[in-house]
Amino acid sequence: MANSLTSIRGDLPRLVDAFGAERLVLDSVSLLEMMYDNQAERRTEIFDFTRSLKEAGVTTMLTSEASESNPYASRHGIIEYLTDGVFVLQYVRSEFRETRLAIEIQKIRNANHSRETKPYEITGDGISVYQEASIF
């Protein structure tokens, strides 16, 4: 299976060009991380893959499962160091109110951004973040 990741990296520029792709979503990078038992190999392969995406010139969104021990980190703690932005999507529960969807921007490289957790919703038109609202 690891050879297929190398193959995808090799085919990526051609596929991006053939589809005229400007954006790419990979759900989930956690599956790629699980392909490698060796931590050093995992880190190298994921680094090479994310570099290939950047070189292909597409805006890329990677989803990742959170670590069980730290909900603000990816399972293997690699991807957040290789990306330009990290967004944490979570459910926020309150004893007295309904569960809300919340987004927190952990990092956006070379940009100032809010450090506040904000409510959001996903609609047929995309994602809406309620910048002026608070969670509860």
List each language-model region with its residue ranges:
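NTP-binding/hydrolysis catalytic cores, primarily Walker-type P-loop NTPases
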Residues: 13-20, 118-136
